[in-house]
């Protein structure tokens, strides 16, 4: 049976992550409060941020910046701003 969490990002009950993907207290908070769906949304934003801003994950400042963006996105409901990105419009 899948583990469910009350996802604070999506504001609904949803399937939880299978295991803690991020280290430390923040990782525990993500594991306990973020769903697989919300984590997937973050991963897409994270990839776009790394590419757009040419972040180097070996650089401590870049990792801190990305972690701050992740916390804002997952727990504070703030969208990640990516220069030049225009989301596709739904075509009905």
Curated annotation (Swiss-Prot):
Superkingdom classification of source: Bacteria
Molecular function terms, GO-annotated: iron ion binding
UniProt keyword annotation of Iron present: yes
Keyword field: Iron
Reported function: Could be a mediator in iron transactions between iron acquisition and iron-requiring processes, such as synthesis and/or repair of Fe-S clusters in biosynthetic enzymes.
NCBIfam families linked to this entry: PRK05408.1 (NF003817)
Protein name: Probable Fe(2+)-trafficking protein
Organism: Shewanella oneidensis (strain ATCC 700550 / JCM 31522 / CIP 106686 / LMG 19005 / NCIMB 14063 / MR-1)
């Amino acid at each position: 049976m899948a583990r469910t969490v009350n996802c604070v990002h999506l504001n609904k009950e949803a399937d939880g992550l299978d295991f803690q993907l991020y280290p430390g207290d923040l990782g525990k908070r993500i594991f306990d409060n973020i769903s697989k769906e919300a984590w997937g949304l973050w991963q897409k934003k994270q990839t776009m941020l790394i590419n757009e801003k040419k972040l180097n994950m070996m650089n401590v400042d870049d990792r801190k910046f990305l972690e701050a963006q992740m916390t804002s996105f997952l727990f504070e409901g703030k969208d990640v701003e990516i220069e030049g990105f225009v989301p596709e419009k739904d075509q009905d």
